[in-house]
């Protein structure tokens, strides 16, 4: 349960902005507000999570294709450097799920944020906010998942550099 009063006290504000923030989070399906019970962090069923990840994968592929088509050489160089950082972080023996997730999110932000389609970017970011705590940190905590992700990074960056939209989006 999320206590409006406790949150307001912690941040030194009245309950009104806290209530408004919780309402906005409810619109994003990050929290659920129940009458006479208050707000709580929203949980998702396996089916809902699976559906979110399927949609996110489609949006990611399209976003990468659009980035490959529209990006400047400088944007591509930045993405490549961020991809190298994912590989460096992922190979670290003491890497945490949080650190690996942050590295992959940096690449994703570069690609999706510069794909040239504001609606796709907004939808992707909203879906990421909903699912991040369920997926990124937990999944990126496993060595097997990190190896899978790292296996896609270099081929995707090479496809982007070659302006091969289809190959880049498929990875």
Language model: regions and residue ranges:
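Short linear motifs at protein or domain termini
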Residues: 1-69, 74, 78
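Short alpha-helical transmembrane interface motifs in multi-pass membrane proteins
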Residues: 45-46, 135-139
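Short, solvent-exposed loop/helix junctions and linker helices
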Residues: 46, 53, 101, 146-150
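Solvent-exposed loop and edge beta-strand segments that line ligand/cofactor-binding
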Residues: 141-145
């Amino acid at each position: 349960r999320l206590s409006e009063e406790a949150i307001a006290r912690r941040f030194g504000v009245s309950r009104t902005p806290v209530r408004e923030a919780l309402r906005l989070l409810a619109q994003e399906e990050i929290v659920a507000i129940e009458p006479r019970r208050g707000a709580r962090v929203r949980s998702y069923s396996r089916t809902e999570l699976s559906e979110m990840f399927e949609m996110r994968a489609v949006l990611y592929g399209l976003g990468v294709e659009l980035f490959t088509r529209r990006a400047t050489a400088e944007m591509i160089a930045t993405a490549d450097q961020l991809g190298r950082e994912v590989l460096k972080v992922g190979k670290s023996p003491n890497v945490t799920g949080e650190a690996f997730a942050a590295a992959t999110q940096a690449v994703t932000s570069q690609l999706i944020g510069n794909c040239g389609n504001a609606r796709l970017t907004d939808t992707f970011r909203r879906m990421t906010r909903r699912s991040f705590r369920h997926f990124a940190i937990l999944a990126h905590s496993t060595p097997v998942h990190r190896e899978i992700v790292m296996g896609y990074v270099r081929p995707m960056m090479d496809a982007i550099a070659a302006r091969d939209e289809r190959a880049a989006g498929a990875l």
